[in-house]
Amino acid sequence: MSVAKKEYKRITVKSLVDMKSNGEKISMLTAYDFTMAQIVDGAGIDVILVGDSASNVMAGHETTLPITLDQMIYHATSVVRAITRSLVVVDLPFGSYQSDPKEALRSAIRIMKESGGHAVKLEGGKEVKESIKRIIHAGIPVMGHLGLTPQSIYKFGTYTVRAKEEQEAEKLKSDAKLLEKMGCFAIVLEKVPAELAKEVAESITIPVIGIGAGNGVDGQVLVVHDMLGMTHEFNPRFLRRYADLHGEMTKAFQNYRDDVKSRKFPSDDEQY
């Protein structure tokens, strides 16, 4: 007996705003390649983020800073080919939007035209408002990113929780309202106190998607390699692992190696 595949409605920017209005939580995961994106999309995840975290998990860099715009477009193109339902948001990498609003718009246009992505994400508030304004005025949907902003790691010096002090918390709240006013369709809040994140989410009408921001926001995002247990070195408090693929994959590779060495693979049934 065959099991019918569950059908999911195509997600749009408006869908996310409607989900917040209806009290439905938003699920978001990263993906960087066709195969992973196909699985994530088929599982009914609402948003796929082609994150600059590819710099870490795909290329082995210590930070997100080295990844280029061309590399982001390559990953995004692979993801877009795979999806039938999820909204695809693509990170603008470090150096592609900070220096000049015109450059920011050019970078965003390249991502949209060359990858087929549905929206872009960039880090920061008031300091990048002109870049955000330029991109949105061109008709490109923008997701904001506040709190811990990994592209500013050398400014912070550490990946610690942000906005614990009153002054920084007030700036974060002000930036969130500014992003909403400018037309951003959603905001990622990373590693901020849960009560503050809840307050921000309740103060604006656009969705707030958290990573290490508690349960009072409108949705959650995780890096797919982390939640699948493919990485063992990264153990933040907010991370829940839903599988141990590192262990399962290691065992599978070892079994394959042993079967090759012992001439058990291929068997007679696996030959032409």
UniProtKB/Swiss-Prot annotation:
Location of this chain's protein in the cell: Cytoplasm
Active site per UniProt: 190 (proton acceptor)
Binding site for 3-methyl-2-oxobutanoate: 52-53, 91, 121
Pathway stated in the Swiss-Prot or TrEMBL entry: Cofactor biosynthesis; (R)-pantothenate biosynthesis; (R)-pantoate from 3-methyl-2-oxobutanoate: step 1/2
Chief place where the protein resides: cytoplasm
PANTHER family per the UniProt record, alphabetical: 3-METHYL-2-OXOBUTANOATE HYDROXYMETHYLTRANSFERASE (PTHR20881:SF0)
Protein name per its UniProtKB record: 3-methyl-2-oxobutanoate hydroxymethyltransferase
Source species: Christiangramia forsetii (strain DSM 17595 / CGMCC 1.15422 / KT0803) (Gramella forsetii)
